[in-house]
């Protein structure tokens, strides 16, 4: 009795080869084109709103400069009030602050969790994709889209706020906007792309850990909120050693870290003087053209008090941006690498 065997031919060898990256990219595009379109539509709508508001802001600022600098002309006060009031659209950037965490929760968290929850990932692995190649093919294109889109939005936000950062504004009494303000710092420069990328990486890792979409979204929101709070409250102020000064005239664009008072070289109190102390020594209004804080500091200095301030000058903005962007990029790479490792080790 003869047993017939079949030799594997070239066609069978071809079926054992890994799927080319180009084909995997095509599959990823078909699976996530709706997500990519949603990202583009969401960021595009924000960009249009910024552009329209920015045009009005820049026109109002140009009119204010023409009427108030270097020679003050009729209508200057009204134009100053008009320009100052226009900042309500994006007061401290709060309107755009949720952008990174929304991307992490609704783009990053479902990208792996949805297939793990439904079980469709097994089909991809049996078609020659492989676990780590399947994971990278899903994460990398979306990560690039997220970073590019939010980076462009950050550039547009910087353009929108450019008139508010001008040093000449203090001449008009226009309230200054610090580039370190929460919500503004996070969404401008390098930080705009790296915060969104970190949120996306957090979401992807949450998806592989909990393996269900809704719990992954909740975990992403919680983890991102904790990271953002810790960064703003404890880390960012100490990227570089704060400067120390006893001069009360600090630019409004600087970031005030802490303030305290001494009297006769001994600590007196923190923060703003008490009402009773002000009434005792400085119950007169400050001289014309002088701010209340500056006038109070000078008045109390005549009674032996000195105001000490630690602060970060606005000139350090880009140094802080590169420091924060660097560690966020490293964190994102670590989270994505951990996600790939977990897919290879844990997913079944």
Regions from the language model: what does each represent?
Residues 15-31, 82-86, 130, 134, ...:
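Cytosolic juxtamembrane amphipathic/interface segments immediately preceding
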